A protein has these predicted regions:
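Bacterial N-terminal signal peptides that target proteins for export
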Residues: 1-8
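Extracytosolic secretory-pathway proteins
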Residues: 23-359
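N-terminal signal peptide c-region/cleavage motif recognized by signal peptidases
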Residues: 17-18
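Residue-level detector of intrinsically disordered terminal segments
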Residues: 9, 14, 204-207
């Protein structure tokens, strides 16, 4: 009997302590008007229905193995140079010549992404929430390739997993000048490269908020970018950044993506920032990142023909025309991104000023 009262008091004290901790979450993570987030997941936004009939009525695209059988039905009578090597050479040195084989673009009306050019064009997508004028031509190119479709597409698995696994891929953002995370009409957003492993739970599989990341000013100084944004109903929207390099190693090969006019649209909380990165991906950089990481062998597992995909990306490119040829060199895109709150550690005495800012 005599032990029940202390036990009850301990329960009440514990509940009060838990409530006070919960109430202090925001002050703990928002320090001097600053809060940082580190990227944990990243992949190209792909709108998909369960049976794919809406967006891919003609079916999925063939990969290297399937195309090889079509192109060389008489392979026994031909040389390796004329068949395997010829295809491999074109994979690594693709052209914009018309594709001799069928390639199926997305035909459905819907896509995730943002309106990048401020216009509603005839070929633009509509967001599932009804927003018109969505620009996402990368989705039009990759949406009917099984390797880019979740949850078990080979690119979905390996490209996304590499973001958390590899310190090389450590991209983070720091918001400064923040009054609160619900509504703020003016905040500064700085993109940094981090240096450290992510904080995870005991399984090592789940990334936790509350870790720390040192700013990489040796190899990452030239990757620092800065822009302005605003927070409305806990959604951060930024102004475009002229160009952003995203380190994206996959399967051990150091590579990156170059996104022009890149902007963030993120749902913010004291522990996470999830949403979209959108802009125009440089076509050649996009392709090099894919083929250098995966090669024909791995791409075949997702029925991804590098030859056909490069032709599609070049054909659908919708921005940054080459001044000499007039050919567009960048293609509109959106990426699903998840970030965990992190405490960003700046080097003592080092001025972490951005190298490039908003246009």
């Amino acid at each position: 009997m005599k032990n029940r009262l202390p036990a009850a008091l301990m329960t009440i004290v514990g509940m009060a302590f838990s409530a006070s901790v919960a109430a202090d979450v925001t002050p703990m993570t928002l320090r001097d008007g600053r809060i940082g987030y580190v990227m944990t997941n990243l992949f190209w936004s792909v709108y998909q229905t369960p049976d794919a009939k809406e967006e891919c009525p003609k079916g999925f695209n063939d990969g290297p193995r399937e195309q090889f059988e079509i192109l060389f039905p008489d392979v026994e009578n031909r040389t390796v140079v004329d068949t395997q090597l010829a295809q491999e050479i074109e994979t690594w040195h693709p052209t914009t010549e018309p594709d001799p084989l069928p390639f199926y673009d997305i035909e459905g009306p819907y896509s995730y992404g943002l309106n990048l050019d401020g216009e509603v064009g005839q070929n633009d997508f509509t967001h599932p929430d009804g927003t018109q004028g969505i620009d996402n031509e990368v989705y039009r190119a990759v949406g009917c390739i099984i390797g880019f479709r979740g949850p078990d597409g080979v690119e979905v698995i390996f490209q996304d997993k590499a973001i958390a696994d590899r310190a090389y891929n450590r991209t983070m953002i720091e918001l400064s000048g923040v009054d609160n995370l619900e509504n703020d009409d003016s905040v500064t957003v700085t993109v940094y490269r981090g240096m450290d492993r992510l904080l995870t739970d005991a399984t090592g599989m789940k990334v936790m908020s509350g870790g720390s990341q040192r700013v990489d000013l040796r190899w990452g100084a030239k990757l620092i970018r800065q822009t302005e944004g605003k927070i409305v109903d806990s959604v951060l929207t930024t102004e475009p950044i002229a160009d952003v390099v995203i380190p994206w190693m996959n399967l051990g090969v150091p590579t990156f993506q170059l996104i022009r006019d890149m902007r963030f649209q993120l749902d913010l909380s004291p522990t996470n920032a999830n949403g979209l990165i959108a802009g125009y991906a440089d076509v050649d950089t996009y392709y090099k990142q894919l083929i250098r990481n995966d090669s024909t062998h791995h791409l075949s597992n997702g029925q991804i023909s590098g030859i056909s995909l490069y032709k599609a990306l070049s054909r659908l490119a919708d921005a940054y025309p080459d001044p000499e040829t007039g050919r567009n060199t960048a293609i509109s895109t959106a990426l699903d991104v998840k970030m965990a709150q992190v405490f960003i550690v700046h080097p003592d005495g080092e001025a972490s000023m951005p190298q490039h800012t908003t246009d």
